[in-house]
Amino acid sequence: MKKLLVSDYDQTFYLNDEDIEKNKIAVKEFINKGNMFVIATGRGYDDFMKKKKQYNIEYDYVIINHGATILDKEDNIIFETTMPNEILDSLKSDLHIENAERYFCCSLLESRIEFEHKNLTKVHVKYNDLEYSNEIQKNLEEKYGDILNIYYVSGNSIEIISKNIDKSKSIKLLSEKIGINQEDIYTIGDGYSDIKMIKDYNGYAMKESVQELKESAIGQVNCVSELLEFI
């Protein structure tokens, strides 16, 4: 039976240059056996494509922007989910980007655009202070929690996508398109935006994962190549 493995990228498929080479070899063997491999990352298109080219990463599909965009290996957009345009002005105000160290928005295959562009798939904001970042995130969740997913990602950064999508929902859309059953889907990750896909499928945690993800996982592994030894 064909299997599908979906892996987060940062701190999962990529830990360091040595680790990613082992993972690439294991994935190639997995694909050659008739299985499918998907990267699911919070990165936008340009940021991920730089890594794909740098490390010559092989995959069947890639899910970017925490699930908001799915591409095939020829970079054709298979699915995309945007945030409601009518909330973008108030969201920009509530993010207090004048106090941010940096921010950018993503749409389609564009990774560095402004709020005014509309039809946004993701917003990234980094602040100078973690306490301030946490306060912004809490306020956003109270006001927009029914229409937006707000993720703490790293450092003092938060990223925002539509509530209608996440990595798990994108996997479901993709699995229906390619005809793979839920019981044949395996997932691995380490961060907050990975938790739902770990819960919904045969999910494994990296050893250095957030605690909530570890509690939801079937087991823990050191790397993707280790997981591929027994699935």
Predicted regions span which residues?
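Non-catalytic pre-domain segments flanking phosphatase-related domains
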Residues: M1-S7, K22, E176-I180
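Active-site metal-binding loops of divalent metal-dependent hydrolases
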Residues: Y9-Q11, R43, D190-G191
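Conserved acidic, metal-coordinating active-site core of Asp-based
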Residues: E98-D200, E208, E215
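Short active-site oxyanion
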Residues: G34-V38, E58-D60, Q182-I185, K199-G203
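Asp-based phosphoryl-transfer active-site loop
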Residues: K2-D19, I39, I198
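Active-site phosphate-binding/coordination module
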Residues: I20-R112
